[in-house]
Amino acid sequence: LPDPLKSQSEPFDRTNAALAGLVFLISFVVYALTVQKTFSFWDCGEFIACANILGIPHPPGTPLFVILGRVFAIIPFVEDISHRVNYISVISSAFTAMFAYLLTTKIISHFFHKEDPHPLHKFIGYVGGVAGGLFVAWSRTNWANSVEAEVYGLALALSVALVWLAIKFWENKGTLKANRWMILCFYLATLGIGVHMTVFLVVPVCAIFFILRKDATPRDYLLICAFAIVELLMIILFADGRGGHKFFYFATALLGAGLLALLYKRIQWAVVVAFVSIASVMMSFSTYEKMLFVSAIILVGMAIASKRLNLELKWKLGLTILLIGFVGISVHFFIPIRSGQNPRIDENNPSRDWRTFKNFLDRRQYGQQSMVERMFVRRGAWENQLGRHPHMGFWSYFEEQWSKPGVTFIIPFFLLGLVGMVTAIYKRLEIGMPFFTLFLLTSLGLTLYMNFADGTHYNFQTGDAYMEVRNRDYFFTPAFVFFGIAMGVGIAAIMNYIREKLSNN
């Protein structure tokens, strides 16, 4: 019998693979030439020291990074141990550039109809992909993260890979291969939390592809993306004492119920249950602990209903996702195990008891208020958080990623990315709209979530909301990376527009 998976696959594109390898190689060489030869300021020294002795750094512990760091520390390819551990970021960020190339070409490939091939279609995709990959590689903040022992290089490599895998799932939806891509995505996402929570930022957008059935229409994708955008607007609406998180939860429940009423026939409910359980880790690990149990009960109930009522609820897929997510998150059990051996660096001593371990993962030492609740208590003026302001303003970081600071220099790059996003939405809404939503979540959404302090809302009684002590540009690296990809798509869109005009003439 013919292999059903093989019949669904496209011919292997050697040129595409070679160019992906070339983008990786160019990025790797540039990073290797500019990598720090010893440790850098802030967290880098702590991570290197912990990697060398398998210690426990500040919460939430970054266990996967520490374990990988130990592997690099014992390989004597350069003399200084700090120099060795820095190469985690060098290699990871080179992979980020490579996956950015693959994601850019994947988006561009949906500009064209396969039934009407043109010799220049692939060439346009290759040019846009290389441009996108190198825009990502050489954006200022990403480059800075790529040459020191920080968690963001590895986190970004996983993030971009997850989005690429999600689109591959969408292309093969309804096949066994697609389910394998989805399970791999959930595993990498939960494993990536062991590097940094930033990895999970892309998962809600990836879930749009996962939870909708094969017969979903472009309107269904648009509705879910619109829901996510409205959520961001509601955070702004209810912030600063205008209702707070309770009103936000209530409004979200109402809108969510309405959305489900519109889409319930085209939703894979078992996947939704598993996703909600895994996504609860963004609230806290304590919440995830409860949701894991609740979701397992719901899926078992779906299994019983499926057999007795002869329904196709795909409960096995839901349980598999739930299990693989737990396996990924289980990397954090390294923390109490190693802490129990009393290494020289053992912050918070998380092996003391289960409660201490959970508080460590939930970063309780930084305050008892959850990050979600903190979003609704403004710690800075909107114009400072979104505009130009020392240590925190999003636009002040964005405008210097590919040019000198200043509106004049950033306008061409901004317009290029805008063209890319608009064209992606116009050509294939099912891909373009989630991609645009992803950029909003990693830019505006992250600005709202982090709620950086500018010093104007300082609380003299609690000491909270003092001005950020250092530049926070690294938190916005995902936004800069995805905008770099959008610029690559924009170049391809302009090239294709010129081709069409010349063909018509």
For every predicted segment, state its role.
Residues 1-30, 95-98, 116-130, 267-270, ...:
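Start-transfer (signal-anchor) and selected internal transmembrane alpha helices
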Residues 18, 22, 100-138, 173-180, ...:
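Transmembrane-helix signature of polytopic, membrane-embedded enzymes
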Residues 253-262, 303-308, 409-430, 493-496:
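Hydrophobic, aromatic-rich transmembrane alpha-helices
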Residues 12-41, 136-139, 196, 322-342, ...:
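Transmembrane signal-anchor helices characteristic of membrane glycosylation enzymes that use polyprenol
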